[in-house]
Amino acid sequence: RQSMPGMMDTILNLGLNDQAVEGLAKKTNNPRFAYDCYRRFIQMYSDVVMELGKSFFEERIDAMKERKGVKQDVELDANDLKELVKEFKQIYLEKQGEEFPQDPKEQLIGAVKAVFRSWDNPRANVYRKMNEIPYEWGTAVNVQQMAFGNSGMRSGTGVAFTRDPATGAKKLMGEYLI
């Protein structure tokens, strides 16, 4: 079977909620990191699972940076990110008519459905046609423990493939960001 790297939607930090974010802040001794993860999760869940888009959230981030006189997200502190979490949850409430889900099981079910739904997104359809991947094959959903790429100067993120994503050639390749 062929892979479709980068075609299916992804939701990071699933399971975070108002209680878990406090536990993450305590465990890592880094409230800024914990609230950054939570605001990213709310944004991704709202976009991928609920299909609200990213613009509402990006506007709030930009407004916060302007208020604080900073240029980059990384310059926002823990209190700024806590405020963004409140604002993001308010956007969710206004757009969905319900509170952001606090139950990790509910979050997981929504995320799994969204990944299956992403099999039919335009990007995936074009990729399948270009690579002659039958629609009937469907897709799988992977759920795995989070490996944080934003927890400080000694963390990063990356992806590895056993095939060249562009050609399908059998060779190990990947990329990373620090």
Language-model region placement:
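Nucleotide/phosphate-binding sheet-loop regions of phosphoryl- and nucleotidyl-transfer enzymes
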Residues: R1-I178
